[in-house]
């Protein structure tokens, strides 16, 4: 009986760690004028995965901006 309780507690701890790691790894949106900055890119095609999320209310068009001090970043604009 004690062994099954230990297994249950260990399982709950593992699930809470997975949930907290997943929640922290979500990409954050930064607004810069009309752009929603998401992810890095080398060309406009790289922005498709960053600008077309299933959680977005509407599809966005993505363009790669090379002039940012942090490096090239995707500018996502609502269509």
Curated annotation (Swiss-Prot):
Keywords: Antimicrobial, Disulfide bond, Fungicide, Plant defense, Secreted, Signal. It is found in: Secreted. One of its GO terms (biological process) is killing of cells of another organism. Residues 1-23 form the signal peptide. Coiled coil: none annotated. It comes from the Eukaryota. InterPro entries: DEFL (IPR010851). GO terms for cellular component: extracellular region. The keyword Cell cycle does not apply. Disulfide bonds join 35-76, 41-64, 47-74, 51-75. Its main location: secreted. Belongs to the DEFL family. PANTHER family: DEFENSIN-LIKE PROTEIN 270, DEFENSIN-LIKE PROTEIN 270-RELATED. This is Putative defensin-like protein 274.
